[in-house]
Curated annotation (Swiss-Prot):
PANTHER family to which the protein is assigned, alphabetical: 50S RIBOSOMAL PROTEIN L3, LARGE RIBOSOMAL SUBUNIT PROTEIN UL3C
Superkingdom as given in the UniProt entry: Bacteria
Classification lineage: Bacteria, Bacillati, Bacillota, Clostridia, Eubacteriales
Stated name of the protein: Large ribosomal subunit protein uL3
Family (UniProt): Belongs to the universal ribosomal protein uL3 family.
Keyword rRNA-binding assigned: yes
Function, as annotated: One of the primary rRNA binding proteins, it binds directly near the 3'-end of the 23S rRNA, where it nucleates assembly of the 50S subunit.
UniProt xrefs under HAMAP family: Ribosomal_uL3_B (MF_01325_B)
Gene it is expressed from: rplC
Cellular compartments per GO CC: cytosolic large ribosomal subunit
Binding partners and assembly: Part of the 50S ribosomal subunit. Forms a cluster with proteins L14 and L19.
């Protein structure tokens, strides 16, 4: 069964398993997400649910968004996201999706916006090799060759060059759910997940199952 939830990355820590082994985990505050709209094949051409997550002051939302929440009878939230789920008909508007939809041992895919690194050179951005650092060398951390000269007399598209790094949508596949703490809506994921602390993340069933 397809499952999905929005969450907020709180940070990383480490826990011990039953064998006493240290496991690095990312703590995610998952939900509660409130269903605010149901998409149907008859009306919209496909089936999906729209969920909202995170508190926000009402005056920070415009009138169309306020009306959208008022129609659902739900208080205004910060984030809105749509998910295609197999059992979307079983969910009702106003119903909450919480962290306990997942179980320990499940595999999930987590999406978020990666940390922005600003303008970076090819060594950091693309793991390029640097030149000699000794006296007399004129090639230290420069780009190097960008292409042939007379033919084709241009630099090809997608050439690895310096530029803006990070701050892009990133998905990490097949991560393990180590522990669920339902009373606090927390999910502990083995390893790291994209984005900074307090960043928005999406948790879904893995596509590699």
């Amino acid at each position: 069964m397809k499952k999905a939830i929005l969450g907020k990355k709180l940070g990383m820590t480490q826990i011990f398993n039953e064998n006493g082994k240290v496991i690095p985990v990312t703590v995610i505050e998952a939900g509660p997400c409130t269903v605010i709209q149901k998409k149907t094949v008859e009306k919209d051409g496909y089936e999906a649910i729209q969920v909202a997550f995170g508190d926000i002051r009402e005056k920070l939302r415009n009138k169309p968004v306020k009306g959208h929440f008022a129609k659902a009878g739900v208080s205004v939230k910060r984030h809105i996201k749509e998910f295609k789920l197999e059992d979307s008909n079983s969910l009702e508007i106003g119903q909450e999706i919480k962290a306990d939809v997942f179980e320990a041992g499940e595999r999930v895919d987590i999406s978020g916006v990666s940390k922005g690194k600003g303008f970076q050179g090819t060594i950091r951005r693309w793991n390029a090799h640097r030149g000699p650092m000794s006296h007399g060398s004129k090639f230290h951390r420069a780009v190097g060759s960008m292409g042939a000269s007379s033919d084709p007399s241009r630099t090809f598209k997608n050439k690895r060059m310096p530029g803006h790094m990070g701050n892009v949508n990133t998905t990490v596949l097949n991560l393990e759910v180590v522990r669920i703490i339902p009373e606090k809506n927390l999910i502990l994921i083995k390893g790291g997940v994209p984005g900074p602390n307090k960043g928005l993340v999406q948790i879904r069933n893995t596509v590699k199952a």
